[in-house]
Amino acid sequence: MPGRASKYINTLARTWRELNPKGILFWEPWELSAGQTYQCVDLLDPTCVGLSLHSNIAEVQIGYPADRWFKNMLTKAAQRNIPVLGELWTGSPTEEMEPFLHIPTPLATLRALRAVNEAGKLKGIKEYYGNLPEQEDPNLRMTGLFFKNPDISEEEALSQLAKPYREAAREVIRVWRLASEAVEMYPWDVSWLAREIGRSSPQHAMSAAILKGASWQTPSWQANRRVAFMRTDQLEAPNFWMVEDVQMRFEQTAEKLEAALRVADLIQNKLPEPLQHTFRKSIEEMGSFRVRVLAYAYHLRETNLANLIRGASRWGLGVNPDNRNELRAVMVKDQANMGTEEPMGTAIRMLDADPKKFLQTYFLPRASSGKNQDWADWGSAANWTITSPNEFFEKR
């Protein structure tokens, strides 16, 4: 593969050089494994080929910029004088966050820019996915500040960024910090399907929570991305500790979002009028983000608690009342988060009236049909609700 790919790229680049004596063809070695890309660098023509690289072997992740693969690629490229463009998110609309377009995480953006810029020798930095420059976008404006002064401190950058918000600037900075920390805390590494959370449904299945993985038949997915993501298939139920880990990180994310929303709600009417619309959209989207994060956390915790109670019963041990009480409390919060009485109401009543029947009915493993995501219906909740099997949505 490296020999064939590099020969093809070199031919294209040399042809371009014949047409444009100063031309450089920038190539993005997408979906190749780390080993393949390293070998390709050794075979490329440095006189006319450049590289455009994701800042992570798993493409681009705001929480994991400039991974070891990216740094190694910069080292190898520098040794052969091959120019490199580093790719990351420079604005709010990203593949990770869509359909949310207004969640402001400028501090996370600055940290990602700095990590990529300091990873090695770069010819430049470019946007990976695309922006909406006509809207107020603190993330994109932060990128502009960084390009102007890569050594700017976080405090100075946030201060300059918030100037248009006038007397509300200090509180707006607080919102940005909390939202950035929430997105950095979010467990992007659990599965590729953890992205695009706005497409997920808070009304999850009442069977045991799963953690849906995704994978494709490419070198990167069948090699390195098995390390980048905790789940790349759905062949086995996730371990208790994995479920708990992801649940706790979802909870931490939700806490940061709740804190950001408290501050944002207090100041939304104090902003200059031209900035109010986008800020209110940010509040709306952060609220929707939090609802979905909580839905994941609740479903995962309900599953582990139900399994703890079942395990005690199987071993002839008494049920820990703390587990049962916590399970009920989580279900009540989950019901409120769903925004609907059912199906959680029936489950809560059964837990109260007949705990044994409840354990035989709810949060049990569901036999998998082996059905994968239906990408013909890209934006469906079935594809993107990672704790619920696709079949659950088909039967609703």
Model-derived segments and spans:
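Substrate-binding groove of N-acetylhexosamine-processing glycoside hydrolases
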Residues: 3-396
